[in-house]
Regions:
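Helix-start/capping segments and mature chain N-termini
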Residues: 1-165
Length: 165
């Protein structure tokens, strides 16, 4: 992965309420979003619905707001659970970064101090550009603390740090 990722935004798939926010096996819309990112020379796609970020093509987007809280999309709005976030959330909070689900509106994203994305296949990555627009200051406090927490989990876990380098 590059030091700082770039993203494009794509329309999120429409799921009925029973399926929304669950890992149900129909990955094609996510694969299509990933392909669109690559076609547009971006690293990832962010899925948008009603002017809000609800998920990533293969990751959970998280932003550090000007209020000091880290926000991630809510499951009830279509985000999928993040195993990576669950692994590091308590440690982030213990290190002074409260983590909360939120409606990640475009205005919230645009005022973010920083953004990262988390995924079991990518670890912790810094996100610095969305649709050609710079977002916050990449590789700042959120990235550094999240990466430190993630590397600690990996070093005491079943996967090797080398798997993510």
């Amino acid at each position: 992965w590059p030091n700082i990722l770039s993203a494009i935004t794509v329309e999120a798939p429409k799921w009925n309420d029973k399926v929304r926010g669950t890992k149900h096996g129909d990955w094609q819309p996510y694969l299509d979003a990933r392909e669109m990112a690559l076609t547009n020379k971006a690293d990832i796609s962010l899925l948008i619905e009603n002017d809000s970020v609800i998920d990533g093509d293969r990751c959970m987007p998280i932003l550090l707001d000007i209020d000091g809280f880290a926000y991630h999309p809510r499951i009830e709005e279509g985000a999928l659970d993040s195993i990576t976030l669950e692994q590091i959330k308590k440690d982030l909070e213990n290190l002074g970064i409260p983590v909360r689900p939120a409606k990640m509106t475009i205005s919230l994203v645009l005022r973010a101090k920083e953004m990262i994305v988390l995924g079991s296949g990518m670890g912790v990555q810094s996100l610095g550009v969305i649709d050609g627009r710079k977002i916050g200051t990449p590789r700042g406090k959120l990235y550094q603390v999240a990466m430190s927490c993630w590397l600690e989990k990996l070093s005491s876990s079943w996967q090797s740090v080398e798997d993510f380098r």
